[in-house]
UniProtKB/Swiss-Prot annotation:
CDD domains: AdoMet_MTases. Pfam families: GidB. Signal peptide: none annotated. Specifically methylates the N7 position of guanine in position 527 of 16S rRNA. GO terms for cellular component: cytosol. InterPro entries: rRNA_ssu_MeTfrase_G, SAM-dependent_MTases_sf. Keywords: Cytoplasm, Methyltransferase, rRNA processing, S-adenosyl-L-methionine, Transferase. It is an enzyme of class 2 (transferase). It catalyses: guanosine(527) in 16S rRNA + S-adenosyl-L-methionine = N(7)-methylguanosine(527) in 16S rRNA + S-adenosyl-L-homocysteine. This is Ribosomal RNA small subunit methyltransferase G. The keyword Ion transport does not apply. Belongs to the methyltransferase superfamily. RNA methyltransferase RsmG family.
Amino acid sequence: MKAFDRPALTAILVEGARGLSLTLSEAQITKLIDYLALMVKWNSVYNLTAVRDPLQMVTQHLLDSLAAVSAFAGAKNVLDVGAGGGLPGIVLAIWAAEAEPEMRVSLIDTVHKKTAFLTQVKAELGLANVSVHTARVEQWNAPHKFDVITSRAFAELNDFVNWSGHLLDEGGEFIALKGVAPDTEVAHLPAGWKVREVRPLQVPTLQAERHLIFIERG
């Protein structure tokens, strides 16, 4: 499927969410598909993702991010580092607007064309719980600390922690979205940090290993 068949894509998203035991409202489903449509439109010019087929985008981007959202329950200030096209941050924000209404999601990337896309998504989808920042995370003076810092396909764990550790609040944690369990990366975590949990994820219709890595001070 290369054409943007909205009913078919919606059906796959709804079925996948059911497989994740997630209940999405009609408004959330509409916004997720609207986000996908924007990604398809902008991708042809801005090269946001190597995935070109909207059907594959539902599984590899939307459902892959939705599989992780429950791990963020209770978080108030979340930072998505190297946000790129908005994964998992935009998906998390769409979910949180109803599921975790006090959550705020900040997206940071160094590439202006990517943050321009994210700013457009925020505006078109009316995501009041999202802020977008163009900066290098290691040099960024954020207006506040974050209780959760996340990333997907951003960097090795030691770099992720070293570059953004100054932005993590006391008692906060990193949640990294990874493919195969990164045992070597875990072994090379810098001093002062420890892995609290490595959690396998099952993403409907995705035949690939996915893991969440929870890192805290210790």
